[in-house]
Amino acid sequence: MSGSSLPSALALSLLLVSGSLLPGPGAAQNAGFVKSPMSETKLTGDAFELYCDVVGSPTPEIQWWYAEVNRAESFRQLWDGARKRRVTVNTAYGSNGVSVLRITRLTLEDSGTYECRASNDPKRNDLRQNPSITWIRAQATISVLQKPRIVTSEEVIIRDSPVLPVTLQCNLTSSSHTLTYSYWTKNGVELSATRKNASNMEYRINKPRAEDSGEYHCVYHFVSAPKANATIEVKAAPDITGHKRSENKNEGQDATMYCKSVGYPHPDWIWRKKENGMPMDIVNTSGRFFIINKENYTELNIVNLQITEDPGEYECNATNAIGSASVVTVLRVRSHLAPLWPFLGILAEIIILVVIIVVYEKRKRPDEVPDDDEPAGPMKTNSTNNHKDKNLRQRNTN
């Protein structure tokens, strides 16, 4: 073997060896965790979710197990629908395996160790095999504490009249943990200037309107314990605060109309079109109407506008348990030639002006024009000339 061919042969042999060590697309790969469940502390009545993400080839199977506090060796498998349907297990398999364990309406008995197990061993479910060898495990500890008792005022309904001040109240009556501070939130956002260290809380709305409605929470934070909160609902009929009064489009274009409102609970939205003065629910037989509803917002999209069908008045209606409201948007659809109308108008004016000029010039000319070949004055005849010649001859004779 020559010296020049030795490095090439060595490189090829190294490539073959390294290729045999790397797992190919169909090669087996042991299960491994990408994401493991995390330990949490919760209050009674709350809920928790644990996530488990595993890889391997073939895709590993995932199971959830549970052991009570101080009984770490007494694991029992958890199934979807267990504990009076408070347990939900959602698992999906693809290139990897992903599973979510969710338990709602927690009780003190839900405390314990939760374990995610994964395996792609062909003998993983053989009872004669040792599970600690065929399955990999990831654990999380869930601690459930007794929720503090919070007494709240009743829900409030805002009326148009009379407009009276509203006072929301919360009172923390019992807790096994030391309070650090408390505050109010509306729809999940902390209200300014409400944070204090007090178990008895009040929030006053002097002139309540529909925009003041929503979910109010009094939130309490403790030392070495999860925060606790209570909810007070402030309800009001919908008040539509924004919409398009009119929409002008050309035939074949798309039109978008929208409405947004304040008020709580979030309304049910309905779009109607007025036919002969009567609002009629929109029937999407043509497949050109698309409606998007999201809490206090709705949107109507019409594609490929038709000048004979789509123009008119469109009404959006918002209705909740307290009341309803509606507004109208006028849709105008112009012809394809609409952009040419200014040009056509100017062209028509020019044509009319030319016609007027031509008619005027024709009327200005005389009815008959004399020919250039005709003499301008009367001509002497030959008879007159002959008569003169005769007189001349007669004088010469005498």
Curated annotation (Swiss-Prot):
The keyword Disulfide bond applies. InterPro entries: Ig-like_dom, Ig-like_dom_sf, Ig-like_fold, Ig_I-set, Ig_sub, Ig_sub2. One of its GO terms (cellular component) is presynaptic membrane. Residues 365-398 are annotated as: Disordered. Residues 1-28 form the signal peptide. Isoform 1 is ubiquitously expressed. Isoform 2 is expressed in brain cortex and cerebellum (at protein level). It comes from the Eukaryota. Residues 361-398 are cytoplasmic. It is found in: Cell membrane. Residues 29-134, 148-235, 238-329 form the Ig-like domain. Keywords: Cell adhesion, Cell membrane, Disulfide bond, Glycoprotein, Immunoglobulin domain, Membrane, Neurogenesis, Repeat, Signal, Synapse, Transmembrane, Transmembrane helix. Glycans are attached at N171, N197, N229, N284, N296, N317. Residues 29-339 are extracellular. One of its GO terms (molecular function) is cell adhesion molecule binding. The chain crosses the membrane at residues 340-360. Residues 149-161 are annotated as: Narpin. One of its GO terms (biological process) is axon guidance. Some isoforms lack the first Ig-like domain which may confer homophilic adhesion activity. However, they can bind and activate FGFR1. Probable homophilic and heterophilic cell adhesion molecule involved in long term potentiation at hippocampal excitatory synapses through activation of p38MAPK. May also regulate neurite outgrowth by activating the FGFR1 signaling pathway. May play a role in synaptic plasticity. Also acts as a chaperone for ATP2B1; stabilizes ATP2B1 and increases its ATPase activity. Promotes localization of XKR8 at the cell membrane. Interacts with ATP2B1; this interaction stabilizes ATP2B1 and increases ATPase activity; this interaction controls T cell calcium homeostasis following T cell activation. Interacts with XKR8; promoting its localization at the cell membrane. This is Neuroplastin.
